[in-house]
Amino acid sequence: MKEIAVLGSTGSIGTQTMDVIRLHSDLFHASVIAAHKSIDKLREQAAEFHPHAIVITDEEAGKKFLEIYDGDADVLIGEAALSEVVKRDDV
């Protein structure tokens, strides 16, 4: 299975990418999903796709996400987290 990092998973291209991953879940797994502020959509995606890590680049949105998220993925906040998360072995 190919592990995929979807940066901007809540945007137009990102949601289309998530659709492809959904259709081909035997081939792909969204191991990392990332968004700037769309934490409600990100929480929905996390519940469906069970990523290993979630990145929210906006600091305030990240704090709010931590209040509403009850999953077990690593949650990283801030722009620098994007460059760190793509270096993971599970991507």
Role assignments for model-derived ranges:
Residues G11, S38, E59-E60, A80:
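Short, ordered loop/turn segments at secondary-structure junctions
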Residues L66-V91:
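A structured beta-alpha segment of the ubiquitous adenosine-cofactor-binding alpha/beta core
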Residues M1-I54:
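N-terminal Rossmann-like dinucleotide-binding module
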Residues G8, T57, I77:
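A conserved hydrophobic position in a structured secondary element of the catalytic/binding core
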